[in-house]
Amino acid sequence: MNLFSMPLGQMLALSEGEGGLFDFNATLPLMALQFILLTVILTFVFYKPIGNLLEEREAYINGNLSDASAKLLQADELCKQYEEQLKDAKADAQSCIADAETEAKQVVALELAQARKDAASLVEQVNKELEAQKELALKQLEAQIDELSQLIKEKLLGKQAIL
């Protein structure tokens, strides 16, 4: 028969007699002493080592957390430094690019001015040569005109002299 399926009256009847549910004899203090002794033994054998282990683990975790926090701060600081260096490098690069563009524009302007000067000089030289050729051609034409006019005169006067 199961203890839980018994009615309350039967349970009380069993407890009144010897060997019932509760017997108040030397067993109860002995069990209390065993319980206290077991608690003390477990405290020294089990709970304290586990407590020490947990404390060590907590100290280890806290140490790692503080190290990680310090390293995170250091990494943030390095990141800021690198970003500043990158910003400075970009500014330097932009400055170099601007200087190179200015220098290239100056070189182009100088070469363009030199090319214009050379072209003007060439045009002037060609104009002088053309003027010289024109003068030469005019002198030759004048000489031919003089010869032709002399020839025409002779022919005209020569015909009149024959008439």
UniProtKB/Swiss-Prot annotation:
Gene Ontology molecular-function annotations: ATP binding; proton-transporting ATP synthase activity, rotational mechanism; proton-transporting ATPase activity, rotational mechanism
GO CC aspect terms: chloroplast thylakoid membrane; proton-transporting ATP synthase complex
Transmembrane parts of this sequence: 26-46
Predominant localisation class: plastid
Membrane topology: Single-pass membrane protein
Regions annotated as coiled coil: none
InterPro entries documented for this protein: ATP_synth_b, ATP_synth_b/b'su_bac/chlpt, ATP_synthase_B_chain
Quaternary structure and partners: F-type ATPases have 2 components, F(1) - the catalytic core - and F(0) - the membrane proton channel. F(1) has five subunits: alpha(3), beta(3), gamma(1), delta(1), epsilon(1). F(0) has four main subunits: a(1), b(1), b'(1) and c(10-14). The alpha and beta chains form an alternating ring which encloses part of the gamma chain. F(1) is attached to F(0) by a central stalk formed by the gamma and epsilon chains, while a peripheral stalk is formed by the delta, b and b' chains.
Job description of the protein: F(1)F(0) ATP synthase produces ATP from ADP in the presence of a proton or sodium gradient. F-type ATPases consist of two structural domains, F(1) containing the extramembraneous catalytic core and F(0) containing the membrane proton channel, linked together by a central stalk and a peripheral stalk. During catalysis, ATP synthesis in the catalytic domain of F(1) is coupled via a rotary mechanism of the central stalk subunits to proton translocation. Component of the F(0) channel, it forms part of the peripheral stalk, linking F(1) to F(0). The b'-subunit is a diverged and duplicated form of b found in plants and photosynthetic bacteria.
Protein name: ATP synthase subunit b', chloroplastic
Species, as recorded: Ochrosphaera neapolitana
